[in-house]
């Protein structure tokens, strides 16, 4: 929806701050994932943005894009969302030997580094009032590209998840 997340406001004492927006039900959906090179030299962020709710079809397309861009085995960490357990997603993963799925424990978003990417993105678009979906798309795309191009931000997302217990084996 085109209702902005509000982080902070200001108004003269005794007056309620007002952030005007158009209450429209337009929205965007984003699929994304952090990548780490096998020798952990470089972090990456791959994402796709859709103007509709994401279904298993888009998840499969996203996985196909990952396989096209990344070499070697690809391990995907997923939360327990029902869309990730859809039969189309499971069938696609079984038919592509390079793709391995691992699941986060139930109700553990703090272990998912991608959740911290979404936090960074929401912070970047907070207190803005896009007039339409195209303006929202520009804001989200700029925010995601900023995160994508910053090794320190990507590293911070991974470090935050590790701080909460995400561990991986060498």
Annotate the PLM regions.
Residues 114-170:
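C-terminal anion-handling pockets and recognition modules
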């Amino acid at each position: 929806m085109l209702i902005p997340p509000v982080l902070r406001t200001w108004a003269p004492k005794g007056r309620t701050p007002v952030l005007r927006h158009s209450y429209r039900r337009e929205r965007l959906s984003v699929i994304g994932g952090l990548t780490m090179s096998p020798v952990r030299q470089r972090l990456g962020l791959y994402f796709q943005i859709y103007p509709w709710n994401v279904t298993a079809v888009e998840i499969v397309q996203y996985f196909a894009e990952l396989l096209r861009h990344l070499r070697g085995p690809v391990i995907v960490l997923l939360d327990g969302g029902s869309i990730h357990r859809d039969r189309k997603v499971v069938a696609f993963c079984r038919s592509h030997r390079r793709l391995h799925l691992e699941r986060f424990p139930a109700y553990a978003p703090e272990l998912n580094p991608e959740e911290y990417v979404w936090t960074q993105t929401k912070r970047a678009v907070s207190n803005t009032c896009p007039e339409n979906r195209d303006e929202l798309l520009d804001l989200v795309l700029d925010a995601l590209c900023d995160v994508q191009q910053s090794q320190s931000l990507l590293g911070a997302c991974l470090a935050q998840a590790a701080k909460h217990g995400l561990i991986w084996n060498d």
